[in-house]
Amino acid sequence: MASYFDEHNCEPTVPEEQYRQNALLELARSLLSGMDIDLGAVDFTEWDQRLPPPASKKVVESLPKVTVTPEQADAALKCPVCLLEFEEGETVRQLPCEHLFHSACILPWLGKTNSCPLCRHELPTDSPDYEEFKQEKARRQQKEHRLECLHGAMYT
């Protein structure tokens, strides 16, 4: 006896593709049933596959310029990108995470990506799609945390 796939001359669906198809079907059903859409069924992992966009030009321009103090110079602090020691009185850029960099080192970096090269602290971008993705990701993490807390509270 021939299998279902042999009889219908087709191939079984890959699990990742099946998930996408189910999400699209759920979206279509929601649209047809009065726009009652549950965004939990929509997969927002598209940005996980791509590089993040550059940091916002406005944010980069507003990064504070800090003068290296004698204490910092004596501590032999180095720029994490070029590994040259900061000199006393030198003007460097400070990211919101408080890491210091030479302007010539950090500005090209932030022109390509939106995060600190050391700790990956993310700066805002000019991409509305990416900002929406970050908000949705934060909402999902918050929801998962609340569910874990609820689950933990049920069994303590």
Swiss-Prot record:
GO function terms (MF aspect): ubiquitin protein ligase activity; zinc ion binding
Reactions listed under catalytic activity: S-ubiquitinyl-[E2 ubiquitin-conjugating enzyme]-L-cysteine + [acceptor protein]-L-lysine = [E2 ubiquitin-conjugating enzyme]-L-cysteine + N(6)-ubiquitinyl-[acceptor protein]-L-lysine
GO biological process, one term: protein ubiquitination
E.C. numbers: 2.3.2.27
Transmembrane annotation, as ranges: none
Taxonomic superkingdom: Eukaryota
Gene3D superfamilies tied to this protein: Zinc/RING finger domain, C3HC4 (zinc finger)
Similarity comment text for this entry: Belongs to the RNF181 family.
Name listed for the protein in its UniProt record: E3 ubiquitin-protein ligase RNF181
